[in-house]
Amino acid sequence: MAGRVSPGDKLPFFRYDTPYSAQNRFRDLLAAQAPLVLVFMNNFGHPVTRTFAERYARTYRRLYSGGFALVVRSRADKLARSIGPGTLPYPLLCDADGVLYDLLDIPQRSGGLTAYSLEAWQILREAKKNGYRPPKDARLDLPLTLILDVDGTVLFSHYGGSLTDVPEDCAAMQALLEELDLARPQAVDEPDDDSDVTIYAPADEAPSIPGLDSRDDRDDVLVKTVVLRLFEDIRKD
């Protein structure tokens, strides 16, 4: 298959790398987590991608009727310097060569005017205040959100029109599964909050994150400053 996917299409099984493991079987990920929400975003060094990666980590426990994985157009070996198996609560698939992006016909845009929403501009503005410098003439991958069944069948697809046109957080993913009647039956109660998420390091051990030092959410200092060493070397990717 090649080209844009729609509900009813079927993704091929493939092997993928993460920053902490190589040649993982996509078949196994689906078997363990379907219905799987699979979100494709730009490279992991981009402030928008980093913002949503942090947001998904913070709200991960709000998604309890399916699984989630994030795909980024970055090299696994470079991300391995700051991302280990316990850094994120969800799998981070690395596709630096864009094999899946090309297979699924994910659009690219050159320059920010055609790819940035208002939220994306706000994220980029804050990132620049903290030292981020976007590459000149860089091509940006627009996002794609899929929900996949255990055999790789596409249950839902949405090609984003801007860099932030993805589920806002994991609670939004849960709501989408329920709206589409795809929620996996659960034997346990819905978690009340995210207070027990354990992916964060002590605040005095974690660096500040360039581009994510939000002035608008000072009550959430823990999250904004201790998403581990997640993004320490990413800007070079």
Please report, for each region that a protein language model flagged, where it lies by residue.
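N-terminal "domain-start" segment that seeds a small globular fold
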Residues: 1-28
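Short loop/turn microsegments at loop-to-beta-strand junctions
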Residues: 11-12, 37, 142-144
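Short active-site neighborhood of thiol/selenol oxidoreductases, capturing the structured segment around
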Residues: 26-56
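Short beta-strand/turn micro-motifs composed of small residues
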Residues: 41, 72, 149
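Structural microenvironment flanking redox-active thiols in thiol-disulfide oxidoreductases
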Residues: 50-103
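Thiol/selenol-based redox catalytic cores and closely related redox-interacting motifs
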Residues: 95-165
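A short, polar/charged loop-to-alpha-helix boundary motif
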Residues: 163-179
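Cysteine/selenocysteine-centered motifs that mediate thiol-based redox chemistry or coordinate metal-sulfur cofactors
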Residues: 183-237
